[in-house]
């Protein structure tokens, strides 16, 4: 019994040692600095929102040489700027215009597609259950059986005063 326990302990330690030294281990992968990039939430972030028209910071913070020269031209009179330069300055500050933000998304198509896929799969499951899981319909549901049952109830004169048999004309053999 001692040998069996010692063998188990050795295999357990060997498994842990290989997991600790292998690079494919999940524990070792979590020590890599490239797993997740941390974002400093104390600094202002950029958001395109209709309810807050001016974000806390500009859309582009890292400016190229052309962008820097355009920012220098911005400090001068705006009448000297061309339309393209004004649009470029706007795009440095904001990612989207109001009309772009108000434009409806196509997300409803994905939602409806998911709903229809779910309904289709549910229909297939119900159809499969009707074929292979549920028992056959009882014979009492057949129209022939219901007609025989009706004839038997009329022959027995069930509820003759105000009910079923009161509406049957026994002399003519038809409903009143």
UniProtKB/Swiss-Prot annotation:
Transit peptide: 1-28
Alphabetical keyword list: Membrane, Mitochondrion, Mitochondrion inner membrane, Transit peptide, Transmembrane, Transmembrane helix
Topological domains, Mitochondrial matrix: 29-106
Annotated InterPro entries: Cyt_c_oxidase_su4, Cyt_c_oxidase_su4_fam, Cyt_c_oxidase_su4_sf
Pathway in which the depicted protein is active: Energy metabolism; oxidative phosphorylation
Record keyword Transmembrane helix present: yes
Residues passing through the membrane, by range: 107-132
Quaternary structure, from the entry: Component of the cytochrome c oxidase (complex IV, CIV), a multisubunit enzyme composed of 14 subunits. The complex is composed of a catalytic core of 3 subunits MT-CO1, MT-CO2 and MT-CO3, encoded in the mitochondrial DNA, and 11 supernumerary subunits COX4I, COX5A, COX5B, COX6A, COX6B, COX6C, COX7A, COX7B, COX7C, COX8 and NDUFA4, which are encoded in the nuclear genome.
Family of the protein in this entry: Belongs to the cytochrome c oxidase IV family.
Biological role: Component of the cytochrome c oxidase, the last enzyme in the mitochondrial electron transport chain which drives oxidative phosphorylation. The respiratory chain contains 3 multisubunit complexes succinate dehydrogenase (complex II, CII), ubiquinol-cytochrome c oxidoreductase (cytochrome b-c1 complex, complex III, CIII) and cytochrome c oxidase (complex IV, CIV), that cooperate to transfer electrons derived from NADH and succinate to molecular oxygen, creating an electrochemical gradient over the inner membrane that drives transmembrane transport and the ATP synthase.
Record protein name field: Cytochrome c oxidase subunit 4 isoform 2, mitochondrial
Origin species: Thunnus obesus (Bigeye tuna)
